[in-house]
């Protein structure tokens, strides 16, 4: 959710002020996400106890980092962005975008690599068994002669089609 807030704040501030962030400021602001740790998360939880709202706590944490009141603050000229944090965004807007980003990241970093590994193993296996003759079955009854490699390759081809669809999926968010 911090990533959504940072990205949105950079975008809305640029639109409303007519000025983009310098590369240095952009990098500093992005470092809020890159350096976010369990220790930082605990600070957000402490803020949440006082404001009784998880996203308000995250907004306050982000603002404190930009204003320089946080020991690891990127500060500099970034305090001018504090009025734009969460401007016009509700909790569901942020959560919706955050979940879409998490789904996309898990697809790219976990699921697709695992599926590709399985596909690679099946391709090698089908190739190895391409000359292993076997009797195919239809409705449980012996039918044509085929090869074990071909019988592995057919569902593998279907799997590859599904992987292409999965790769091209877009994740929708409320905004």
What do the PLM-derived regions correspond to, one by one?
Residues 1-175:
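A helix-coil-helix interface module used to build multimeric assemblies
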């Amino acid at each position: 959710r911090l990533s959504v807030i940072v990205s949105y704040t950079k975008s809305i501030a640029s639109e409303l002020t007519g000025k983009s962030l310098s590369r240095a400021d952009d990098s500093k602001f992005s470092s809020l996400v890159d350096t976010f740790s369990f220790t930082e998360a605990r600070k957000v939880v402490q803020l949440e106890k006082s404001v009784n709202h998880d996203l308000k706590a995250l907004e306050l944490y982000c603002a404190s980092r930009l204003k320089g009141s946080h020991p690891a603050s990127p500060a500099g000229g970034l305090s001018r962005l504090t009025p734009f944090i969460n401007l016009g965004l509700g909790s569901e807007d942020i959560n919706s975008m955050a979940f879409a980003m998490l789904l996309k990241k898990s697809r790219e970093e976990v699921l697709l690599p695992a599926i590709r590994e399985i596909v690679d193993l099946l391709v090698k296996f089908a190739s190895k068994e391409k000359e292993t003759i076997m009797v195919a079955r239809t409705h449980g009854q012996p039918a044509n002669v085929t090869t074990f490699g071909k019988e592995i390759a057919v569902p593998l081809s279907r799997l590859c089609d599904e992987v292409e669809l999965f790769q091209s999926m877009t994740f929708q968010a409320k905004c």
